[in-house]
Amino acid sequence: MKRKCQDYESRLPDNTAVKQQQLPAFRLQLTASEILSGFFAIGLFCLGMGIILLLSAKSIKEVEINYTEKCATCAKLREEATNFDKECNCSISFYLPQKMEGNVYLYYKLYGFYQNLYRYILSRSNIQLVGADVKDVRNCAPFRTSDNGLPIAPCGAIANSMFNDTIVLWYNFNSSTHIRVPMVRTETAWWTDKYVKFQNPAFQNLSSAFAGTAKPPNWPKPVYELDENDPGNNGFINDDFIVWMRTAAFPNFKKLYRRLHRIGNFTEGLPAGSYSFIINYNFPVSRFQGQKAVVLSTLTWSGGSSLFLALAYLVTGAVTLLASFSMMALHLKLKERKTFFLQ
């Protein structure tokens, strides 16, 4: 019997704080006043951030010009597929009442274009876009190969539907002097997209790298000729192409097109005065009953003119404060009842 007791005791864990699970621990016991203070602090913080973000968004200067109806003649021309090789330009004049100081950004905006459709998003080849194999078109239905059987580069529905209007901004200094506003067409894409997700094939000559492939059906030129003025902005690393390939979550969206080159008369930004947009109309929107617009905008430390983040903070802060006052009222009521019974 004694031996059995010794065997049993030998199997017991050591009598230490760790093995006996007797380590000292801090057990947080929050009081009602501490919880209410935390809720009030969170609510006030969210309200304060919402007000700051709202004021920041309101300080942004933005001009949006819808040119769907103003370029109706060109739109009608583009409805016929046989007119794809006919050039059509339209001019849109507007007046800028106040100077847009600092960096100014030019966007194109589409209404009613659903880039978030499941089959549309999947219609691309990431293997092709990183330059590993320009003939990889496995996931690009229905735009895999051309009528001649050649693999399309870049393939897929996203690339084929790329926005291809050409937008030029002119400053009408006076009735006889018109100055083209200098714009930068690079550094408009995300850094990770430009240098990680999109790469050209490892060839010095891009035309040779894309030999044996065909351009997308809706494109007027192959991918290695997208920028005739800058050889370093051609192929899969073209900024306009990369920006378009980052699909939007909502049917109404804007994408960065150009940045103001702050030189000459535009060192401090866009001066107030008369301007004109000359648009080479190529992208049809009547087929899906959409609309097109150009947007000139400045930015602040908080980003663009979207009010979503500011409203989200304001709503969160308001709901939190409302809950705080409700809990405080309930706490005081229960406290009074407890005091009454103790008496």
Curated annotation (Swiss-Prot):
One Pfam family per UniProt: CDC50
Topological domains annotated Extracellular: 56-306
Membrane topology qualifier: Multi-pass membrane protein
Chain ranges on the Cytoplasmic side, renumbered to this chain: 1-34, 328-343
Keywords noted in UniProt: Glycoprotein, Membrane, Transmembrane, Transmembrane helix
Gene Ontology CC, one term: endoplasmic reticulum
Domain of life of the source: Eukaryota
InterPro entries xref list: CDC50/LEM3_fam
Subcellular location, record wording: Membrane
Transmembrane segments: 35-55, 307-327
Chief localization: membrane
Glycosylation sites: 66, 164, 205, 265
GO terms (BP aspect): phospholipid translocation
Family the entry assigns: Belongs to the CDC50/LEM3 family.
UniProt name for this protein: Cell cycle control protein 50C
Organism of derivation: Bos taurus
Gene that specifies this protein: TMEM30C
